């Protein structure tokens, strides 16, 4: 069986090296190793829903602690919406597990025990470095800096998490790193001609990333989730102005999640500007041809985290009417996903 072999030729595309394909130590790949294709696909599809929903709820429970029971319903609803998103099947589990990574890192930050480092090390079993790992590590380094400044002391716990997570990716995707670092094989992306857009073209790409699904990240947010989040954010701003408490608005979690979405969209747009892309490749030569605009792959999770925060704001009014509106909004958000004819939306097409 060439699946576990090294230096073997795989009978596809006229014959390519097995080492050029993804690692065998990945949950989604393992499904196809031991199951018929149809059942492996279905199992992976439903695992994506289970992992996406479960990890989202775990994160919400960890963040809100004793207050979590108050938001349990909308946490499950928003998590289910995230799990149902018709994301690229081969990496659907990697998309779905993003909240799990955040959950583990929060436990590490709070000194919950050394075994959380072990869980972080094996996390790449669910993930994929080229789509998510590189950016998780970059975000984690930023978190170390920000938390250290905020706490006025170096955050060693999260700093240690950086090499632990990196080592996990190297071990679980050893073929990828072997090809990248110890092989003279050139990737097709090194020779691909990328767009070099002007200012208006870059703005168009940023707008597209903010409003529509990009690549394999079909978040289905523009129809309903985006308007709900913007309306609630404006409502929070108006309330803060009326109470002369803009400081509270500036600390709004919803605001910062939406700003992170905008940042990811900015990076996506700037990728299509030749000088900016050239600067990135000059600073990091081994990553020449790497699509660093994949920051947008984190936006599906961020959009439904923003939805949860918007619904939570309605719950926090303490009024039954707004709670019912929040519950209705959660149902509509799920219906939009199920009824959208997206490429990988098996619930719609079947």
What is each residue range found by the language model?
Residues 85-93, 248-317, 346-350:
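Membrane-helix boundary/interfacial segments in multi-pass membrane proteins
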Residues 50-62, 70-150, 158-177, 337-338:
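Membrane-embedded helix bundles of polyisoprenyl
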Residues 40-51, 88-92, 128, 173, ...:
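Hydrophobic alpha-helical transmembrane segments of multi-pass membrane proteins
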Residues 30, 55-63, 104, 108, ...:
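Hydrophobic membrane-targeting alpha-helices
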Residues 62-67, 107-118, 146-157, 240-246, ...:
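Membrane-interface junctions at the ends of membrane-embedded or membrane-associated helices
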């Amino acid at each position: 069986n060439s699946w576990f072999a090294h230096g073997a030729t795989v009978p596809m595309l006229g014959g390519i090296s097995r080492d050029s394909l993804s690692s065998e130590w990945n949950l989604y790949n393992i499904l196809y190793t031991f199951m018929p294709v149809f059942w492996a696909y279905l199992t992976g599809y439903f695992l994506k829903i289970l992992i996406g929903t479960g990890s989202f709820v775990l994160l919400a429970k960890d963040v809100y602690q004793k207050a979590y029971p108050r938001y349990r319903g909308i946490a499950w609803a928003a998590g289910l919406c995230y799990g149902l998103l018709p994301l690229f099947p081969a990496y659907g589990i990697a998309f779905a597990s993003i909240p799990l990574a955040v959950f583990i890192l929060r436990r590490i930050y709070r000194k919950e025990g050394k075994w959380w480092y072990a869980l972080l090390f094996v996390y790449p079993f669910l993930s994929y470095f080229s789509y998510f790992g590189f950016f998780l590590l970059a975000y984690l380094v930023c978190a170390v800096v920000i938390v250290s400044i905020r706490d006025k002391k170096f955050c060693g716990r999260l700093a240690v998490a950086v090499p632990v997570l990196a080592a996990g990716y190297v071990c679980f995707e050893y073929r990828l790193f072997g090809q990248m670092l110890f092989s003279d094989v050139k990737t097709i992306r090194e020779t691909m001609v990328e767009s070099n857009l002007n200012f208006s073209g870059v703005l168009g790409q940023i707008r597209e990333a903010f409003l529509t699904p990009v690549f394999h990240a079909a978040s289905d947010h523009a129809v309903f989730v985006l308007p709900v989040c913007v309306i609630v954010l404006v409502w929070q701003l108006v309330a803060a102005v009326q109470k002369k408490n803009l400081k509270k608005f500036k600390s709004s979690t919803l605001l910062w999640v939406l700003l992170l979405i905008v940042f990811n969209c900015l990076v996506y747009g700037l990728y299509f500007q030749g000088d900016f892309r050239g600067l990135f490749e000059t600073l990091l030569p081994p990553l020449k041809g790497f699509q660093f605009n994949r920051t947008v792959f984190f936006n599906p999770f961020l959009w439904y985290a923003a939805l949860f925060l918007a619904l939570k704001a309605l719950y926090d009014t303490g009024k039954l009417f707004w709670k019912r509106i929040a519950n209705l909004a959660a149902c509509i958000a799920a219906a939009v996903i199920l009824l959208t004819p997206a490429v990988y939306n098996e619930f719609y097409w079947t």
